[in-house]
Amino acid sequence: MTSDDTDDTAGADDVALDPWGSATISDYRALFDEFGIEAFEDVLDGVPTPHSLMRRAIIFGHRDYRRVAAAMRNDEPFAALSGFMPTGDPHIGHKMVFDELIWHQQQGGDAYALIADLEAHSARGLDWAEIDEHAEDYLLSLLALGFDADEGELYRQSTNRELQDLAFELGIEANTSEFEAIYGFGGDTDVSHMQSVVTQMADILYPQLDAPKPTVIPVGPDQDPHVRFARDLAERTRYFKVTEAFASVAFDDDERPLVRAAYDARSQYAADTDQPRCTEAADWLAAEPAAADGVDAATAESVVQKLENAGMEPLRPRVRFFDRQATDEAFTALIDEIAGEKRVFEGHVDAFELSAETARDLALAVEVDHGGYGFVPPSSVYHRFMTGLTGGKMSSSEPASHISLLDDPETGADKVAAATTGGRDTAAEQRERGGEPDDCPVYELYAYLLAGDDDALAEEVYAECANGDRLCGGCKEQAADLMAQFLETHQENREAARDVLAELDIDLDSARV
């Protein structure tokens, strides 16, 4: 979940996302199918005053962002966190993450920014002097861009004891086979590298130590393995699991919709619609294959078999509370708090008069009251990677491919002027056929950075390029001027931020060697 200096990952078509590898995604759509990332456009309408990166589909995907957007709309607590691995100068690719974090803070979220120095040391092998130098540069740029340090929190992994304690507790829930399956770790992987992963899981959940709340992690898609692992760990630490149930038999997540459909259709088969029997529902599903449209055959067969095995037991909706790892006192308190009809079993409780939402809220409240974390599974948003100015990937190891936030304005402008474009071979061909802004690193500069909040400018550049009215020379000149202006202002703001950083409780001189 950290941004480092490479911005490089394996493509989705390779069915591998490596947080420490290279970052070129050949088909972002494949991420939806392969990894369950959802399209951001599906939640865009629910986001108050969306950021330009959202409006322009640069933020293209999400996991569970609806709960964060709902918190914004309802003026409820939420948080945003991002980490930065200080392995080189911050560049314009990192600015995108800075902007996302700052925007969430401006929308009312509790904002957290961290320096992933333990990860940089263990996974990248940087010495502590290098880490200290780069950490300061990242923090100065973040503050210069508008991060409110009085309202947010900045920290280093290596000096945050609460974080380290949380990482230790989360490590109890993780095992080496998961590291192998998720990250490809093997027998030659350093233990410190594994430990840094658990620390990142703690980073992601750290904003909820004071109280559970929706939390969004803005990242590139290469960091999705971290997000998925953190969501799994958040669930494992919970005292209770709340599910929909219909009988004493347990149905899997993919089976419940079909059971719900059978219950809703009870008037078609039940002798007593107030008390449909499981065996009646099984017979109806077996005789009505259309009821299982969209459900794979194995799932439908499993549902029918389970219903048959339940026999004459009534098919009746309920909410089921499973005891995962609650203390005896917490489980007893939960039973006492459940209103209305309930049935208590060894390891779970069925409640017949609670909605699923009310049940989840109740389970969370009881857990927190009895010393549990109550973690809400973290959400995430995913942005596209910027193309390098030379046309390939953007990497700090290739100075010509990126613009550092520390570049002087003239150098930044020169890099833009030398950038690859999506233009045609000749001006005449460009006027006749139009350019290719979708394959142009210079247009990306406008869309990602230079147009700022001015959608009209980004749209104008795109349209003029595509229809042949804009030639690459003039477009580069305009972009170079805007880049120089941005860098000049940014570096002035960085200097002003030095006094702010000096007053913060964050140590930039590591005692480590």
Swiss-Prot record:
A motif ('HIGH' region) lies at residues 86-94. It comes from the Archaea. One of its GO terms (biological process) is tryptophanyl-tRNA aminoacylation. A motif ('KMSKS' region) lies at residues 393-397. GO terms for molecular function: ATP binding; tryptophan-tRNA ligase activity. Its EC number is 6.1.1.2. Transmembrane segments: none annotated. It catalyses: tRNA(Trp) + L-tryptophan + ATP = L-tryptophyl-tRNA(Trp) + AMP + diphosphate + H(+). It is found in: Cytoplasm. Keywords: Aminoacyl-tRNA synthetase, ATP-binding, Cytoplasm, Ligase, Nucleotide-binding, Protein biosynthesis. It holds the Pfam family tRNA-synt_1b. One of its GO terms (cellular component) is cytoplasm. NCBIfam families: PRK12285.1-3, PRK12285.1-5. Belongs to the class-I aminoacyl-tRNA synthetase family. This is Tryptophan--tRNA ligase 1. It comes from Halobacterium salinarum (strain ATCC 700922 / JCM 11081 / NRC-1). The gene is trpS1.
